Amino acid sequence: MLKGIPSLLSPELLKVLMEMGHGDTLVIGDGNFPHASIAGDSPLIRLDGHGCAEVLDAILTLFPLDTYVDAPVSLMEVVPGDNVETPIWDEFAKIIEKHQPGTTIRHVERFSFYDEAKKCYAVISTGETALYANVILQKGVVK
């Protein structure tokens, strides 16, 4: 146990966050996300039983978002014609605003999101049941 580090962050995840450098990305995937096939040879960290919002909040206590890009946070946009509400996006926005005010969030078409996710340094698998709750974070620098 360590003080000041959310207990949700496993030693494996802390190691990955420390290994990542400026510009590296990671994806937090919901329960429907194809974690293993997207991860390929990248680290796949399982946080079953946890939701994407709580994982995002825990990670952002330690993880600086990139201020040198227009939008260091990417969400998978809803597929046209898919009549799905995305209230979790509001939760994400509040969490991001709490940790790094003024951060821009962009929405990425589904298959483009998958392509970007395949390039991520690591993939985090959650038990999130909300649809379209996938998020890519780009690491910044500690100032």
What are these regions (language model features)?
Residues 1-48:
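Long, hydrophobic N-terminal alpha-helical segment
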Residues 1-5, 18-23, 50-54, 97-101, ...:
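Short linear motifs at secondary-structure transitions and domain/linker junctions
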Residues 3, 24-27, 42-45, 66-76, ...:
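Structural motif
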Residues 4, 8-12, 21, 50-54, ...:
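Conserved active-site and cofactor/substrate-binding residues in soluble primary-metabolism enzymes
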Residues 4-11, 36, 63-73, 102-117, ...:
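Hydrophobic transmembrane alpha-helix bundles
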Residues 39-71:
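A phosphate-binding glycine/aspartate-rich beta-alpha loop in the early core of alpha/beta enzymes
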Residues 80-143:
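Glycine-rich, aromatic-bearing surface loops/beta-hairpins
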